[in-house]
Curated annotation (Swiss-Prot):
Family affiliation: Belongs to the type III pantothenate kinase family.
The protein's Enzyme Commission number: 2.7.1.33
Keyword Transferase: yes
Highest taxon, organism lineage: Bacteria
GO biological process per UniProt: coenzyme A biosynthetic process
Class in the EC hierarchy, top level: transferase
Entry protein name: Type III pantothenate kinase
């Protein structure tokens, strides 16, 4: 990769994985992940950067829900790129085309916040329901007029699957996959069906209910690393965007309002 090309590096530090996205000309040209490990060392992360990031960047924006790793990444980015990264969060001031806090400010994970901002800023939509299937399953609604309306947080597919394996003595581990039928006749098939149909009904149920509650139409956007196995089951119209979170982080990073103190 051309080392002279200036780019934006977006990092999403999640509970299960850490996503890295390189933006060039407003497009994602590189998207890779590494497994999250609370014991990650400086040398491990530096080696990962050296192996994968043979380019220069002029900006680095980070969203993190694992604060214990923040300092390592801040130090490595400064050492590697000679710049200080900007950490985005819900409680900073941003210059956006809508007010996310129209319904009042409340504590919100930076990844969820990034999803909701990207849903409004990147699409010509007025009301959006965003479902993110990662370590957690988050389902939040946002409106261009009213801001963030709120949402639900549940455990994600892999958390549920591993919890079942840990607590069912006779159940052996097997690869999860999209179920072919609602009613299956094998144990593994029935587990797959139960695992993914619960999210289908949860997402579709929330989608239909918020339309009744708010008496308006909503668009559904689905994202998250575990979403691909669920998509064939969804029976309402939706947009799938695997890069939604990093796009939102980038928007927020470029929209931070810096206050100068005399």
């Amino acid at each position: 990769m051309n080392k002279s090309l200036l780019s934006e590096l977006i990092i999403d530090i999640g509970n299960t994985s850490i996503a890295f996205a390189l933006f060039e000309d407003n497009k994602v040209n590189l998207f890779i992940k590494m497994k999250t490990n609370l014991m990650l060392s400086y040398d491990e992360v530096y080696s990962f950067f050296k192996e994968n990031f043979d380019f220069n960047v002029n900006q680095v924006f980070i969203s993190s829900v694992v604060p214990v790793l923040n300092k390592i990444f801040e130090n490595i980015i400064f050492s590697f790129f000679k710049i200080k990264p900007l950490f985005i969060s819900f409680d900073l001031n941003y210059d956006l085309t809508f007010n996310p806090y129209g319904s009042g400010k409340f504590l919100l994970g930076s990844d969820v916040f990034a999803n909701l901002v990207a849903a409004i800023e990147n699409y010509s939509l007025e009301n959006v329901l965003v479902a993110d299937l990662g370590t957690a399953c988050t389902i939040f609604a946002v409106s261009r007029q009213d801001g963030i309306l709120g949402g639900l947080i549940n455990s994600g597919p892999l958390i549920n699957f591993n919890s079942l394996l840990d607590n069912a003595y006779l159940l052996n581990k097997f690869p999860i996959s999209t179920p072919t039928n609602l009613l299956e006749r094998t144990t593994s098939g029935s587990v797959n069906s139960g695992l993914f149909y619960q999210y289908k009904y949860l997402i579709e149920g929330v989608y239909h209910d918020i339309k009744k509650i708010y008496k308006r139409g909503f668009n559904l956007i689905i994202t998250g690393g575990n979403a691909n196995l669920l998509l064939p089951l969804i029976e309402v119209e939706f947009i799938f965007n695997i890069h939604l979170t990093v796009e939102g982080i980038r928007i927020l990073g470029n929209s931070i309002v810096v206050k100068f103190v005399n």
